[in-house]
């Protein structure tokens, strides 16, 4: 039974455990199926099943919290205008996605946050370490050290002892996960251990779509039912990933930032498919609409979109009058701020509003 995925150190009677394995009953099945159906599939008594359901329900129920006890914490982006746009910065205890096409500055933004989290509370940091989980290439440490050298320019009025980080890489844990199996192992098992050993304030996953695209892409040579099975499997894996990261973020008061890839968005004839179709409605939560010159759509679909709290987009734009290219930092949706655009630049100091 998969109860260990939801509750740590839960004692499970071996007899009942084997009965659940033979009956292929999951934790979700135990909590949702009719008691007579559970009896039929596990051959356990009704009293045993009801007792188990009560125990697990108590362990999984959310902790009561009144609105007066809720406190919002944020991690600074390193730029005053971006922080104001986000109503404080990157929210702590939530999942934040940063999406954009190749070369838009996603990795730059993530590395910048790895430095910001090391800053003291007085500067909007958390005085904690960062975890950088990469799925495509290792962390660009040369660029990380360059950003650290230019921190005095970003904070000219701050006390130098607060902003000079001699060894910025010492408080950035990094690992390369080239496949989905290693990624799941790191996040499910090793990351919680690291949280207990050190003060972690930020987790970066760059990027979330890479391994899922590689291992669960559609195989047109196989049957349609196999494709549907892959889609369902990917949806379950994405839900589990989001739940694990969200739980860690909430328990340890950490910010979680996930970089996501995008693909081209093909405009459709909405008169034919209707205004309530997903293609039309997705303009309001994808980050691009049909008025953009080259509309994109974030990877991993609606399942992933429903699992993140905040979506940010880095958009490349070219001025038709001057033919000059620029970048836009867009708040697509967030519980803390409305949809807004800020023009940004990338330089030696990192990403800043301009």
Swiss-Prot record:
Name the record gives this protein: DNA repair protein rhp57
One example GO MF annotation: ATP-dependent activity, acting on DNA
Places the protein is found: Nucleus
Record-linked PROSITE patterns: RECA_2 (PS50162)
Keywords: ATP-binding, DNA damage, DNA repair, Nucleotide-binding, Nucleus
Gene3D superfamilies to which the protein is assigned, alphabetical: P-loop containing nucleotide triphosphate hydrolases (3.40.50.300)
Classification via Pfam families: Rad51
Binding site for ATP: 100-107
Main location: nucleus
TM regions (residue ranges): none
Function: Involved in recombination DNA repair and in the repair of gamma-ray-induced damage.
Classification via InterPro entries: DNA_recomb/repair_Rad51_C, DNA_recomb/repair_RecA-like, P-loop_NTPase, RecA_ATP-bd, XRCC3-like_C
Entry's Gene Ontology BP terms: DNA recombinase assembly; DNA strand invasion; double-strand break repair via homologous recombination; mating type switching; mitotic recombination; reciprocal meiotic recombination
Coiled coil spans: none
Tree of life domain: Eukaryota
Annotated family: Belongs to the RecA family.
Gene this chain is encoded by: rhp57
One GO cellular component term: site of double-strand break
CDD domains associated with the record: XRCC3
């Amino acid at each position: 039974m998969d109860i260990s995925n939801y509750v740590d150190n839960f004692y499970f009677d071996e007899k009942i455990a084997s009965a659940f394995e033979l009956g292929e009953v999951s934790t979700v099945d135990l909590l949702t199926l009719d008691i007579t159906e559970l009896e039929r599939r596990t051959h356990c008594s009704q009293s045993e099943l009801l007792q188990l359901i009560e125990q697990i329900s108590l362990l999984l129920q959310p902790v009561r919290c009144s609105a007066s006890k809720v406190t919002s914490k944020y991690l600074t982006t390193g730029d005053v205008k971006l922080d104001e746009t986000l109503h404080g910065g990157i929210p702590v205890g939530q999942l934040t996605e940063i999406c954009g096409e190749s070369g838009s500055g996603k990795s730059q933004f993530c590395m910048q946050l790895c430095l910001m989290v090391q800053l003291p509370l007085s500067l909007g940091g958390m005085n904690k370490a960062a975890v950088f989980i990469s799925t495509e290439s290792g962390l660009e440490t040369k660029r990380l050290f360059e950003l650290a050298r230019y921190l005095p320019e970003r904070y000219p009025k701050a006390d130098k002892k607060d902003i000079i980080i001699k060894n910025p890489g010492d408080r950035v844990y990094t690992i390369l996960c080239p496949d989905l199996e290693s990624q799941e192992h790191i996040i499910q098992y090793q990351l919680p251990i690291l949280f207990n050993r050190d003060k972690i304030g930020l987790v970066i996953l760059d990027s979330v779509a890479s391994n899922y695209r590689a291992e669960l892409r559609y195989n047109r040579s196989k049957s349609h039912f196999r494709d549907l099975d892959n889609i369902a499997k990917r949806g379950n894996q994405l839900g589990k990933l989001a739940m694990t990261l969200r739980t860690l973020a909430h328990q340890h008061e950490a910010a979680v930032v996930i970089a996501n890839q995008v693909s081209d968005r093909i405009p459709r004839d909405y008169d034919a498919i209707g205004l309530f179709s997903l293609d039309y409605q997705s303009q309001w939560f994808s980050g691009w609409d049909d008025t953009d010159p080259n509309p994109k759509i974030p990877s991993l679909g609606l399942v992933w979109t429903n699992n993140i709290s905040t979506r940010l987009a880095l958009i490349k734009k070219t001025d038709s009058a001057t033919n000059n290219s620029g970048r836009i930092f867009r708040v697509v949706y967030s519980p803390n701020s409305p949809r807004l655009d800020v023009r940004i630049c990338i330089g030696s100091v990192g990403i800043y509003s301009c």
